Amino acid sequence: MLWCVAGLCLCAGAAPLVVGVADMCPSTNAVNVQATYVAAVATAGNTPVVLPATTDRELVARMLAPLDALLLCGGEDVEPRRYGAKPSPRLGKVNRRRDAWEFLLLDEAVKRRLPVFGICRGCQVINVYFGGTLWQDLPSERPGQIAHRSKELHSVRIVQGSRLAKSLRAENLMVNTSHHQAVKDLAPGFRAVAFAPDGVVEAIESDTLPVAGVQFHPERLFVLLGREEFRELFKGFVTRDGRR
């Protein structure tokens, strides 16, 4: 049986993917991955590998060599100077060391055509890395009818025909929301493929690379709430075939 996700095809029953999981504790810069990210990758049948944080380019290259995919996790705000903006008074904590590390990871992933999936901050990092910008604080810069940092779920509209829609087999879903920043100007070569009711971008994907990101937290929906539709994001949305 052959099924396709992220514009790529994978044979059912293929060997588990080895997925590098990148996260960092904001207060100590220590490696500190939330259990739900690891559990989502493992429960979907793949093998999670927690990556040590480093800005040593050679070491980053060696770490990514055996991987089949890379997962960029949620966390602090991205340093605004990386997208040519002055810090807003409402900017949250930034972690410049983490920014530098994740940009190095993306350098190497792009070089290898390694599939990359970003969640929350990870989606924002992808957009900034490829030349996009961010809303630094939605409540003050782009107020709308939705509280995007809330315990409440809200709906998202997924663009018909997008890789995300094909992966989730849906065009409307209820998702969680835990962010005060979001994609503002989309990076060249990317398209927005999901939107909140107030127009905030909820997912992006590359036109030419196996790279995508979502603003919500599918790992929590899958692992904590048992939302099986999100399994596919961790099973095959990024696939080994993407780096060929």
Predicted regions and their residues:
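N-terminal beta1-alpha1 cap of cysteine-dependent amidohydrolase-like domains
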Residues: L2-I119, N127-Y129, W135, P139-S167, ...
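Conserved catalytic core of two-component histidine kinases
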Residues: A194
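Catalytic nucleophile loop
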Residues: C123
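A glycine-rich beta-turn/hairpin centered on an aromatic-Pro dipeptide
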Residues: T177
